[in-house]
Amino acid sequence: MNPNQKIICISATGMTLSVVSLLIGIANLGLNIGLHYKVGDTPDANTPNVNETNSTTTIINNNTQNNFTNITNIIVSKNEERTFLNLTKPLCEVNSWHILSKDNAIRIGEDAHILVTREPYLSCDPQGCRMFALSQGTTLRGRHANGTIHDRSPFRALISWEMGQAPSPYNVRVECIGWSSTSCHDGISRMSICMSGPNNNASAVVWYGGRPVTEIPSWAGNILRTQESECVCHRGICPVVMTDGPANNRAATKIIYFKEGKIQKIEELAGNAQHIEECSCYGAVGMIKCICRDNWKGANRPVITIDSEMMTHTSKYLCSKVLTDTSRPNDPTNGDCDAPITGGSPDPGVKGFAFLDGENSWLGRTISKDSRSGYEMLKVPNAETDTRSEPTSHQVIINNQNWSGYSGAFIDYWANKECFNPCFYVELIRGRPKESSVLWTSNSIVALCGSRERLGSWSWHDGAEIIYFK
């Protein structure tokens, strides 16, 4: 065979093999397509059963090997249907208070990166409850902790974190930026409000669903401020109490009604209350009650009752002779529903709360009349309306050898109960001004909820040894 014949023979053989390979490839492709449609035509055999739920996402792994066909990771999403919170239930009967949470932030912060905070509170949503506070933008052991006794700075922010944990840079969520705040969930999404800026020209930014929606300028040029605990929503309307003006004279207080972060109505304070700050609010049977701080005159607390559906309110003073602000004079013979009861020194007031429910009424106050130390709960039937009402039950929360601070109300409105169970928190302030051996001012938190049982008292104080921070 000559060279040309060899070349022709080799070329023919190569072409034949190429054609055979092509035919095999086409046959393989056809076979796979046929098998694929065969699998698709038999859903009972190879399609996973998908269970739809009322929660967020169901992920089902069903690995089926059949003629090289692999089905895996089928994801079916079904949005949970949410509705606006409806405050139709009454308050639960309370005979004592059980522990809910204690974060031990100062104790943990002796040896961990824990944020400096103050003005803490708790607030719940359909998924559970979270702790909130105004961070100072530094940690207890950080050098910037020097000077955190001051309330207002550009470095503060409203943060939230899982209930029971201590706040660190690694577990908190920033809700908004500012040095005064409130936050609440309407059943569909969360509204958070932060005040920031200079004393003479502060402003509020209202966030809803994680986005800024509304801005509010100062109306009196004197430290625009708000509740420092949760607001409450009813059928989508979320009233918030804000004050602008002097802390020791008549100020301009407004009740602003929001829906989805947008202003629906603004009311000037009406009624007998003469000074309003730092209201602690809760809702039941369609109404919202806010128990506030009269920083100008009253050792008895102002009460604002809000009808959020009508978007109207009234104000008065807690009638009981059991005084609950700090500092305060001795309890008088009679209370006053319409005017402040003066007296007490040296501090003009502290944030506090009460649950006012006829015979089922409870008041919280520091044990000391003169300083923010100790904390007790007093059952005072008809405290809202009876000027001679007095305690019938008593429970120590913090003994008087330990510091307390602000306190406020909250309720898990989504708990599966026939009634709304009252809960409260106490801020446990440590550091300056009382403990000047450290440079910082911060707090831990303890929270308790109502019980129908009659439980014993115990002191839930902060427990950190300041000497360890030196």
Swiss-Prot record:
GO molecular function annotation: exo-alpha-sialidase activity; metal ion binding
Catalytic activity: Hydrolysis of alpha-(2->3)-, alpha-(2->6)-, alpha-(2->8)- glycosidic linkages of terminal sialic acid residues in oligosaccharides, glycoproteins, glycolipids, colominic acid and synthetic substrates
Active site: residue positions: D151, Y406
UniProt keyword annotations, A-Z: Calcium, Disulfide bond, Glycoprotein, Glycosidase, Host cell membrane, Host membrane, Hydrolase, Membrane, Metal-binding, Signal-anchor, Transmembrane, Transmembrane helix, Virion
Binding site for substrate: R118, R152, E277, E278, R293, R372
Residue spans, topological domain Intravirion: 1-6
Bilayer topology annotation: Single-pass type II membrane protein
Cofactor: Ca(2+)
Locations listed in the record: Virion membrane; Host apical cell membrane
Broad class of enzyme this protein falls into: hydrolase
Annotated family: Belongs to the glycosyl hydrolase 34 family.
Function as written in the Swiss-Prot or TrEMBL entry: Catalyzes the removal of terminal sialic acid residues from viral and cellular glycoconjugates. Cleaves off the terminal sialic acids on the glycosylated HA during virus budding to facilitate virus release. Additionally helps virus spread through the circulation by further removing sialic acids from the cell surface. These cleavages prevent self-aggregation and ensure the efficient spread of the progeny virus from cell to cell. Otherwise, infection would be limited to one round of replication.
Protein's name according to its UniProt entry: Neuraminidase
